Amino acid sequence: MGIKSFSDINLERKQVQKIITHKDYKPPHLDSDLCLLLLATPIEFNKVKMPICLPQRESSWDRCWMAEWAYVHGHGSAKGLNMHLKKLRVVQISWRTCAKRVTQLSRNMLCAWKEAGTNGKCQGDSGAPMVCANWETRRLFQVGVFSWGVTSGSRGRPGMFVSVAQFIPWILEETQREGRALTLSKASESFLACGPHYHPILLSLGSQILLAAMFAGDKSNY
């Protein structure tokens, strides 16, 4: 964590102490496709590692991004080191509109596709975050966790994300059970903030890469 490239010498690795799988996740069905990673040691926050808000309720967002690791030619000495963190502007689609395109759409899911005219291609890293901005409060929220999609991000083929807001009660219950309870922020009742030391990481169960990335604004291709 704390890097944009696997070849970065500042790469920080964290040991996962426990993986908490949602009890309703039953493959091949992808409803409740979510897990929590509890880390063995605390994260020391700095300008490139910061906590993110979690929405308590679903709402419509008009400025969102999806992050993923992408292979970049000409960087790194080995293919594994050529992975760079990219972000892509995406547009949230209403549940009703998405249900017309996706059969048996769960209420626990939300949909988004690539914003028209946006450069880049959504590869669909399972577990990648969908992050949206609230400009009134100047806060970022992790609204979704990528689950599945076929050439997701293209118009007509939305990417499917687990809706974080739908799982807040479960997150509260599990973090409380582990003695690392997620707490309601005193500043606002519209978002949740983690405790002072340990922070749960939300991840789709199909994810192959642990993605911990924050956004400081739409200022670059990363």
Predicted regions and their residues:
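Extracellular trypsin-like serine protease catalytic domains
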Residues: 62-192
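Short edge-strand/loop segments of extracellular domains
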Residues: 1-7, 54-59, 89-94, 150
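Cleavable C-terminal sorting propeptides in eukaryotic secreted/cell-surface proteins
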Residues: 189-222
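Envelope-exposed proteins and targeting segments
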Residues: 12-15, 30-35, 62, 86
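Active-site substrate-binding loop(s) of clan PA
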Residues: 20-26, 42-80
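Well-ordered beta-strand positions in beta-sheet-rich domains
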Residues: 11-18, 51, 84-89, 161
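Conserved beta strand-loop-helix elements of the APE1-like EEP
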Residues: 35-41
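Conserved H-D interstitial segment of serine endopeptidase catalytic domains
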Residues: 1-27, 95-97
